[in-house]
A protein has these predicted regions:
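Structural signature of tandem-repeat unit edges
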Residues: 1-14, 24-40, 47-62, 71-85, ...
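Consensus positions within tandem repeat domains that build extended binding/scaffold surfaces
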Residues: 17-19, 65-67, 87-90, 110-113, ...
Length: 337
């Protein structure tokens, strides 16, 4: 029977639900601390009878998937600075949990973290957290206050689904903002030209998905991140005005949009896979047919599925978008100095 587990290093690992249940390690009382099972610096599971306020041990790096799921007797959890990942469903169905603070050391809060927390009212996410998914979901109607940090680079448009938060946000021409973030657009209202509010730093994943009545978008200089699928399948979106300052365009951000040309700013640092994938540029003269690459200025933006065995990237290219060389997998890629 498994009696000991040793993780070398403190890097976060994803521990799946009930990963050690029934093992010798799990059944050894010496491995439990105040109703919590730790594996190295990872919080793996909790006892079903754990109650009151839980103080997670200092030095903990991650909270495992479903670690506190259905622990109906806990009323609070103190998460120490140093925890880096909170995995999917970590606090799902904690029916007596009312408030919780996520420290700034956490890099990512995964999906459905607080789903089914029927008594939850307030969540504070401290500055430093970078990514927040759809952390609520069903039975979170009592959540009326969520404090978001200025540090977010990724958030999901479904972040507040299942809560009462959206009831307290007044949309601007069908677009919902919270703090510095554009969260969501009502596809039945937004139309024509959309001017994203100045001061916005990120557009949430899938925020404008299938908003087929919009024809053009103007982005502010404050914008830094366009998250995955933000304008996915906007069938009539033919023009986007970018401003200097934007740094990251995530995968499939404008997939399926008939945009014939992109004037991308010099501030761009990364472009995700298929960020602008559509049939709008199939016959464009900006294709380097010999090497199977499509360019917008000094950015290699797309690649043909079938490429030659040797691909030479154009001299002066500053950015190669994610995944564009992954089609037929050329044997040799030459990148000029």
């Amino acid at each position: 029977a498994l009696e000991d587990i040793i993780f070398l290093g403190d890097e976060p690992v994803e521990i799946w639900r009930r990963a050690f249940s029934g093992s010798g390690y799990y059944n050894n009382p010496k491995n439990w601390e105040n109703g919590v099972l730790y594996v190295g610096n990872h919080l793996a599971e909790t006892d079903e009878n754990i109650s009151g306020v839980v103080n997670i041990r200092p030095g903990t790096v991650s909270v495992a998937e479903s670690a506190f799921e259905s622990r109906h007797l806990i009323t609070g959890v103190n998460i120490p600075y140093g925890v880096r990942y909170i995995h999917q469903g970590a606090f799902r169905d904690c029916s007596q949990l009312k408030t919780i603070t996520v420290p700034g050391s956490v890099e990512s809060i995964s999906y459905h973290t607080f789903e089914g927390c029927t008594s939850l009212e307030k969540v504070v996410i401290e500055d430093g957290v970078k990514r927040v998914g759809e952390i609520f979901g069903r039975d979170c109607q009592n959540v009326t206050q969520v404090v978001l940090p200025d540090s977010l680079t990724y958030l999901d448009s479904a972040l507040f689904h299942g809560t009462s938060i959206l009831n307290n946000i007044k949309p601007v021409n069908g677009v919902y903002y919270i703090g510095k973030y554009l969260l969501y657009a009502d596809e039945e209202i937004v139309k024509g030209k959309v001017i994203v509010k100045n001061g916005t730093t990120a557009i949430a994943a899938h925020a404008f998905r299938e908003c087929n009545m919009i024809t053009s978008v103007e982005l502010p200089a404050s914008l830094r991140h366009i998250n995955q699928g933000a304008f996915d399948s906007c069938a009539n979106l033919a023009s986007v005005k970018f401003s200097e300052g934007i740094e990251v365009i995530d995968p499939e951000a404008f997939i399926g949009c008939p945009i014939p040309k992109f004037n991308l700013p010099k501030s761009i640092k990364r472009i995700g896979s298929r960020a602008f994938f559509s049939n709008a540029y199939e016959n464009s003269s900006r294709w380097d047919e010999k090497n199977g690459l499509y360019y917008e200025g000094n950015i290699a933006l797309a690649g043909e599925y079938y490429m030659p065995e040797t691909v030479t990237v154009k001299k002066g290219t500053k950015i190669i978008a994610d995944g564009i060389l992954g089609g037929s997998r050329p044997k040799r890629v030459i990148i000029p100095a």
